[in-house]
């Protein structure tokens, strides 16, 4: 998820015209402020103006930070079947812990790994957050092989979290946080992967608030294999009779949003008889998109890294969700996060929502921790993020 090429592209094109659905204005925006022919720069909010279909002629003279205030127009029927509502279906938080102790299997509950605190989840729930992505390790759930029986203790603990979240009316995303691997080796047996998902889905088939995430951040894998693993998961889930649930599919190269439209184009071929596929992407705002630094590249980087994914979703008639995002507790990152979320909000015809990375009881002073009441991310960002809840 390196950002070098992207950064140079935007630097070179800073004075060029913005493309279809691209950003063209907003507080702190230093990129293009005019649009290609057939599109007009329309004010969405103080942070974001967007090139939307219109008849305004292109112009090459505009101040770099000018906010354009013309009337917003709807996307054409040829590219989308619905206009953006400006309201997310889901907005929430990742919950980490069940996947901790990587490489130590099975590990001990309370020593190598833990499960989310349902009390702090309810604290977030009371503020409007309505989706929680809960990580777990496949090696702990099925210790012997992908097709083997469940570890009952681990499944029981996971199920307790599922029931607590969904009984509150929120959605829970079951996230095998395995990077397309099992015991460190790339999963290549698609039949076994299908069976794994058929077995998992059978346990939650009657709970429509459960969302199945095929696997966290496939990376450095054959692209066709990533397609086939996702399709096998979909097929297994539906074969279990789990027909009411959404399925989040992830892409190669850490499912990065900024490179999605050049890396994961083949995933448009995924099929689901229930038509409930949502494309999950992740995006961080530091120099290499890794989410390992408190520093963000710029106040505009959030939008810059997501526009290509937005265009891909719309062009292919797909729905997306930003399954992980975060930024450091500083003003530059806050502006970048705000711009990112405003872009998603302006494009809710294709973006269903977003989830912050991450809450969880063991984060301590982790730079992005969203664990109430004192997590660094929670204390700095909660007042902003909760304004985006449905």
UniProtKB/Swiss-Prot annotation:
Catalysis: reaction(s): Endohydrolysis of (1->4)-beta-D-glucosidic linkages in cellulose, lichenin and cereal beta-D-glucans
Matching entries from SUPFAM superfamilies are given as: (Trans)glycosidases (SSF51445), Cellulose-binding domain (SSF57180)
Q: Which residues are glycosylated?
A: 157, 261
Indicate the enzyme's highest-level EC class. Answer: hydrolase
What residues form the membrane-spanning segments? Answer: none
State the InterPro entries in the record: CBD_sf, Cellulose-bd_dom_fun, Glyco_hydro_5, Glycoside_hydrolase_SF
Give the family per the record. Belongs to the glycosyl hydrolase 5 (cellulase A) family.
What name is this protein filed under? Endoglucanase gh5-1
Please name the source species: Neurospora crassa (strain ATCC 24698 / 74-OR23-1A / CBS 708.71 / DSM 1257 / FGSC 987)
